[in-house]
Amino acid sequence: MNTTTIMIIVAVVIVWAVAFTVMLSLTKKRDAGEQKFIEENRDKALLHLYCKQIKVDGNSLANLSFTTGKNLQTIVALSGGQHTIEGVFETTESIGAKTRNIKTENMSFDVSLDAGHSYSAAMYFYSAEERSSYYKGEVGKAIVEVPLSFSVGSDFVKAHIIVYQEN
């Protein structure tokens, strides 16, 4: 190897090491922020939302107490009771070499939350019953399930927006 090749390899390794360190630091900071948020709001209902363009009871995130979780979900602290959740949900599934990407329009649904509990809301390709069977009951309690069906090309696609109360 000549010196130019060695210099390029060294430069790439240095850039990779710096980027890796920065990303590791950001991940640790986000994890610490999430844990602090959860601790500060343990007396509220914590809703982990895996969607975009979120509104709760007609209010945008700017008017709500929220943080970003380690999986880039939005965690919102809410009082117990009935709430209306709005958002654009997305999910992806890989079947062999084929990838299905599904995105909803703005969806709205009502959910009743209890203070002191944690919940997650996301879109899945399988119903709560199918997921519970597949994961041998190792999923939370489904408190809301909104079945969706789409016609994408010649494929018939079904999906579900499910809100789970976490174990």
Protein language model features and the residues they cover:
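A short tyrosine-centered beta-strand micro-motif
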Residues: 81-86
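Short loop/turn and low-complexity linker motifs enriched in small/turn-promoting residues
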Residues: 1-77, 88-167
